Amino acid sequence: MIENWPKKPEGSQWTDDQWKAVVANGRDILVAAAAGSGKTAVLVERIIKKIINEENPVDVDRLLVVTFTNAAAQEMKNRIGEALEKVLIDEPGSQHIRKQLSLLNKASISTIHSFCLQVIRGYYYMLDVDPRFRIANQTENELLKEEVLDDILEEEYGIEDNTIFFELVDRYTSDRSDDDLQRMILALHTESRAHPNPEKWLDKLVEAYDVEGKTIEDLVYASYLLEDVKFQLETAEQHIRKATELAMLPDGPAPRVETLQADLALLGTLSSAARESWTSVYEAMQNVSWQTLKRIKKSDYNEDVVKQVDSLRNKAKDEVKKLQEELFSRKPESFLRDFQDMHPVLEKLVQLVKVFTERFQAMKRDKGMVDFTDLEHFCLQILSEQSEEGEMKPSAVALQYRNKFAEVLVDEYQDTNFVQESIIKFVTKDSESEGNLFMVGDVKQSIYRFRLAEPGLFLGKYKRFTQEGLGGGMKIDLAKNFRSRHEVLAGTNFIFKQIMGEEVGEIDYDADAELKLGASYPEGEDVAAELLCIQQTEEEVIDGEEGAEVEKAQLEARLMAQRIKAMVDSGYEVYDRKTDSMRPVQYRDFVILLRSMPWAPQIMEELKLQGIPVYADLATGYFEATEVNIMMNVFRVIDNPMQDIPLAAVLRSPIVGLNDEELATLRAHGKKGSFYEVMSSFLKGAPLEEEKELHDKLEWFYNLLQGWREFARQQSLSDLIWKVYGETGYYDFVGGLPAGKQRQANLRVLYDRARQYEATSFRGLFRFLRFIERILERGDDMGTARALGEQEDVVRIMTIHKSKGLEFPVVFVAGLGRRFNTQDLMKRFLLHKDFGFGSQFIDPRKRIKYTTLSQLAIKRKMKMELIAEEMRVLYVALTRAKEKLILIGTVKDATKEMEKWLDAREHSEWLLPDHIRAGASCYLDWIAPSLYRHRDSEILLELGQGSVPDEIYGYDTSWKVEVVDGNTLLAPEPVQEEKQELLEALREKKAVPLESERKEEVYDRLMWKYGYEEATSHRAKQSVTEIKRNYQSEEGSDNAFIKKLRAPIRTRPRFMEKKGLTYAERGTAVHAVMQHVDLKKPITEEVIREQIAGMVNKELLTFEQAEEIAIEKVISFFDSDLGKRVLAAKSVEREVPFTMMLAAEEAYQDWQGQSGESILVQGVIDCMIEEEDGITLIDFKTDTIEGKFPGGFDQAKPILEERYKVQLSLYAKALEKSLQHPVKEKCLYFFDGNHVIKVEE
């Protein structure tokens, strides 16, 4: 009992809570260990105390210690061993300690999968499994699944009168393939295996759709959605209450108050109905009627306040409108009919899943292999049996393990799943109040839901257990952080006290959850946490969203490079615990954390340009590496030489070494047939004198190829690979190239991959190539081979997930403005552990589809879980920092975002309103509103404190909040002052104060003039848009751009400029619609509106862009003479990309270089039509005309024609070169005013 626990020794460094976690026993114990709280040390100490307990010592092999990774298990064993050896020094005669050291290697300190394997190896005879089984390779597993599924579906297609199956196919597949159906079966199989009883979970999924005799109130989906209805109505009420407060201000629109009170009454009626039943809300929603606002004389009131009041009211109305449209536009009974109709189809789908699972298990059994989920389920099968009631209960084997283990200790408990929880439950005592289960973790760091981890298991116990442990389990909070400075902890607390709550975030960030200072640091300079929000540049992003992402990555990388270089150069100091002193920061002290790695290559490139050593363990790029790509093509040719593209790639590669002319010469010897056939034919004849060198190269390769093909039929794949490396000399060749060691390492990895493949159930070169194709199809490309150790003095770039458990003196968290990945919410079908299956209702006969109740509920639930998971990911990122935390994010429009974020100032509670937190689309949407309520926020100092209470406004944390103009980051930093004089002298070709024996040589080299200097000030690759700009620019070329880089000018961001969508964004949206208009359908408002909705669903347009599309203007084009010609044209091509070579003097007006220089020009032609008498080129424009030119279109026409003349001339030239046909007409079409300009040369 509690009073019998050993007292903490005098002078002990353990905190009271840590000591309690070390010695408490007699019940199940849950330790909520915050980041940096020393949980591993506590866990080791608890184990040691149990082993050396004088009254009741426990052998180490009577403890089951479950860790999250094999590395953690090994570290745990090492720590226990070291601790036991220290005890042995004090007690050299202790046989008990010696025994423990000998037992340690056999102790059950491992991952859950290793424990499962141990159980299965011991009791394999209870299963239908070969004891010599091996663990399946992931890709091998996927190939087997594909094989099994193909066989099952082929059988189903062959069954006559298989009505329900074909209805399933019609509803959930496209005309081209049944890939979607296959994905559904595999997803259901995977999700079911995350439950202790997969079949039972699948059966419940079908039962949920059996609504015979039920009302909508009986459905779990409806009850959950009603909670969401209450949430949204409460949000609407908050908007109206705030509007009322503003209206009652001295300069507020007081006449609005009466209407707002009526609004509150209406919302109150709806909220009351929501507390009753779905039917009540439905009926209330049919009677919603908003009062019309009374007209007021706006000059009598503060115009800004009036706008705010009206805006808040509109937001409230939009909340209700959204509910009406999504949930209450249909009668309750129509939702029930959806379930009735879908029930037999879903039943068939689940039957297919069960058949698949059975066949897949049988195939793995035949091949003597198991996967990781099999390990869990086989173990559970051994440890459990079925009771008379059909429930799972512990088996005789489980009871043996219960008797064996004195205690079961689980590390990282927050990442346990349902199956693992069941395994643990069966080997521990059955009573929480008298249990022997010790769990350690931090639910705030549970970030593996995508691996089916279930944080709800931790949360359930945390809510159920008490600190005293009376009548149940005990919970212990370890909140003291021994890792970080006060500034890091206080900054993290300040943010999470405002954003993490039970309703949104799944856990209250209360006093128990807050991080408390446990580490001592010397005074440091510049240790305040920072938020740097970058305003994206105003340059038009030609490449769309992808281009915008590239620019964001570049801007953030440039800013981080500048900061890292400045901190290193200035001697910024960090604390070194080993020497107990401050020391200058090193590159190894920095880490850049990202949510995912797509930006990593760009950040690495930018840091390298600044001379900063950097390392990232990239998970992609291996198969794109040149040397690997060439070798894969060699193997494709060995497998099947009739493939032209791989063969041409090999012939052109350094292995054979043909140039373009030689390749063309070979092709000219046989215009028909494959390259291989032409090569064979060419080698049979006697070569011409000028073709002898080509003949020798090809003969050498041809003979090698025949030998390799014969070798591949008889020998192993790995031997073949090494034979190719040796006989071509390619392995040695790449070793002599730049980054040669890296390239050779990549080729060795390919060899190792082949050896791993041959250890599977598959054999042969063809299967290996298919194996690699599957890896690439699944997006499982590997990173290039590691050629740099992680202990080097380099800046590290890693994902937040990879950083878990690590710590760094200086942490940059970048990409905070990137949107959360919500792709899972957009899938055609959704799966949830509690709510089962949800998809649209699809009627292929009527060709209609619409959202179902189950889909809405699951989507909402998954979104809230995603929000909670992203909060936890952010918590992990912020708590990696020891001394300095720098947060960086980029936004398109800082002014617009600030208007949204500053809403937080109007709330007086610590926890921000649910709708602000749940409505976040990126991390900045949480961080910025939180910091804009603190005194250190400059914008708050400008605009005032608002409703923020002093407790929040003056919270004891130090922040630097800054908005950085992206334009200033495009220019390099000024040259260091001490080098300026020398550089100026060199630039002016003056003598420099430096004596040298090679003075004359140095002088001659410095005086040397590059022969192609003119070309260095012009880009070798241009877009048509840039060339057009150059012609319009006073400076005439992008030479000005390069000059600007030499003289950086820093300007203040234009915060106060209010913007919606930019002209470029509007233009992009209109072009996207014109590209996708179905010309075979009648061009009506309904058709265009349906098309735009489809584009939004496919994420080709954003909602904001869709709202900006003037549909009537699109229709006007097709009603015009030019539009009718498009509809009647022989052929129509839209968004036609092109690349062509252009003389430099044609691209640059100021070109003074050598004639004959060319540049590469690329562009995209909006539309080209082919008519009987030739080709017409059309370019769509969204320029504003009406109201901009006093003289109307007559004044605008010559200006616009001159503006776009060069652009259309280049488009026409590109078409004429590629099609070998003249362009008869070049037209500009302006949507503003429905104007056409025919551009003449």
Curated annotation (Swiss-Prot):
Give an example GO cellular component term for this record. Answer: cytosol
- Is ATP-binding among the key words of this record? yes
Record bears the keyword DNA-binding = yes
Q: Which InterPro entries match?
A: AddA, DNA_helicase_UvrD-like_C, DNA_helicase_UvrD/REP, P-loop_NTPase, PDDEXK-like_dom_sf, PDDEXK_AddAB-type, Restrct_endonuc-II-like, UvrD-like_ATP-bd
Its GO biological process annotations read: double-strand break repair via homologous recombination
The UniProt keyword set, sorted, is:
ATP-binding, DNA damage, DNA repair, DNA-binding, Exonuclease, Helicase, Hydrolase, Isomerase, Nuclease, Nucleotide-binding
Residue ranges of domain UvrD-like helicase C-terminal in the record: 505-805
Q: Which reaction does it catalyse?
A: Couples ATP hydrolysis with the unwinding of duplex DNA by translocating in the 3'-5' direction; ATP + H2O = ADP + phosphate + H(+)
**Which coenzyme or cofactor does it need?**
Mg(2+)
Segments crossing the lipid bilayer: none
Q: Name one GO molecular function term.
A: ATP hydrolysis activity
> What residues does ATP bind to?
A33, A34, A35, G36, S37, G38, K39, T40
In what residue span(s) does the UvrD-like helicase ATP-binding domain sit?
A: 12-485
Top-level taxon in the UniProt lineage: Bacteria
Q: Which SUPFAM superfamilies match?
A: P-loop containing nucleoside triphosphate hydrolases, Restriction endonuclease-like
Give the function comment from the record: The heterodimer acts as both an ATP-dependent DNA helicase and an ATP-dependent, dual-direction single-stranded exonuclease. Recognizes the chi site generating a DNA molecule suitable for the initiation of homologous recombination. The AddA nuclease domain is required for chi fragment generation; this subunit has the helicase and 3' -> 5' nuclease activities.
How is the subunit organization of this protein annotated in UniProt? Heterodimer of AddA and AddB/RexB.
* PANTHER family xref list: ATP-DEPENDENT HELICASE_NUCLEASE SUBUNIT A (PTHR11070:SF48), UVRD / RECB / PCRA DNA HELICASE FAMILY MEMBER (PTHR11070)
The record's comment on protein family reads: Belongs to the helicase family. AddA subfamily.
Q: What is this protein called?
A: ATP-dependent helicase/nuclease subunit A
Q: What gene is this protein a product of?
A: addA
